[in-house]
Amino acid sequence: MSRFLQAEINLKSLIHNFSKIKAHLRNTRVSCKIIAIVKADAYGHGAVEVARVFGLLGVDYLGVAFSEEAIVLREAGIKVPIIVLFDREIEGVFKYNLIPVIFDYRQAEFLSKEASRRGVILPVHIKVETGMGRLGIYENPCETIKKIAQLDNLKIDGVMSHFSRAEDLEWTQEQMKKFSKIREFLHNLGMKPLFHIANSQGLNYKEALFDAVRPGLMLYGYGAEGFIPCMTVKTKLLDIRKLPKGTPISYGGTFVTKKDSLIGVIPVGYADGYFRSLSNKAEVIVRGKRVPVVGTVCMDLTMIDLTDIQEVQIDDEVILLGKTGSEEITASHIAQWAGTIPYEVLTSFGGRARRKYIMEEEE
């Protein structure tokens, strides 16, 4: 029998989160399109299944990082318009009807020539730099967009930017100010593409909503009150060992039993996205109770202290991420223990875990 490591994705929770964002936009009295971000395999949740759900819910666009991600969706039958955020690859753009994001003039010229050669009009979005310091047109963005608009066979459907610290009101307002000036300039020229800058945290600012929003983490249950995490990661106890006081556990003996102890072994390690930095810090749930991770997390195995759990047995379920009864371990908890962010936690679990999709109401 193969080892059990399962990422359970609750599509009911996904639907709840998407609907909550739509309700927020409606209550804010803003008519906004939604660009659902499904890059990195939908943050580890499985892009194809997640995109299908969003398509049924009437999402306006999907957003991916690279063309290869979009091609997987197209070949799975996803028809929703797909924006490719960070790529210069062109073959997939034309073959699979994708919308590339342009982040410099040279890229725009190249796409224009290719579109002209193929005899098609290519819809594009343009990224402008407002404070992220990563990708985007940063020198004379207004004039550069004006020049791009004059290129053959390109249709500017959108202009975007990205918040670098949406939790910082002053900095975010400065970014919005720069973005608004570009929007005003283009409107004065009679150009009215779709403007979008708001990520999940940006939804908190009404003035950031513009013409579209790009929720990511929030869709998967994190970032604000009332959103429900969609992913549960579980495994089963591989072994249970009775060890005397003073026994060192795992590599380096970083944990030594302080009393006679019951130590469980689970078939999960850092190769599965369960970070080594969780050693002696994290907790998991066994039989409805939290128990600590002890010793160094190994490549394929992790040890947990079961001393206080009654009648525990081999093959008992172990919750690494998720809720059971009154106990819950979230990606935010794991991120805090590991010294990282929830995004990294969710995207790291997808590698060797088998996914199972369910439709269940949250208890």
Curated annotation (Swiss-Prot):
Role of this protein: Catalyzes the interconversion of L-alanine and D-alanine. May also act on other amino acids.
Gene designation: alr
Native source organism of the sequence: Thermodesulfovibrio yellowstonii (strain ATCC 51303 / DSM 11347 / YP87)
Cofactor requirement: pyridoxal 5'-phosphate
Family: Belongs to the alanine racemase family.
Residues given in the record as substrate binding sites: 134, 299
PANTHER family noted in UniProt: ALANINE RACEMASE, ALANINE RACEMASE, CATABOLIC-RELATED
Lineage of the species this protein comes from: Bacteria, Pseudomonadati, Nitrospirota, Thermodesulfovibrionia, Thermodesulfovibrionales
EC number in record: 5.1.1.1
MF terms in GO: alanine racemase activity; pyridoxal phosphate binding
Residues of the active site: 39, 251
Claim: Isomerase is one of the keywords in the record: yes
Reactions the enzyme catalyzes: L-alanine = D-alanine
Pathway: Amino-acid biosynthesis; D-alanine biosynthesis; D-alanine from L-alanine: step 1/1
UniProt cross-references to InterPro entries, sorted A to Z: Ala_racemase, Ala_racemase/Decarboxylase_C, Ala_racemase_C, Ala_racemase_N, Ala_racemase_pyridoxalP-BS, PLP-binding_barrel
HAMAP family linked to this entry: Ala_racemase (MF_01201)
Positions of post-translational N6-(pyridoxal phosphate)lysine modification: 39
One annotated Gene Ontology cellular component of this protein: cytosol
Keywords: Isomerase, Pyridoxal phosphate
Keyword Protease: no
Top enzyme class: isomerase
Single Gene Ontology BP annotation: D-alanine biosynthetic process
Protein name: Alanine racemase
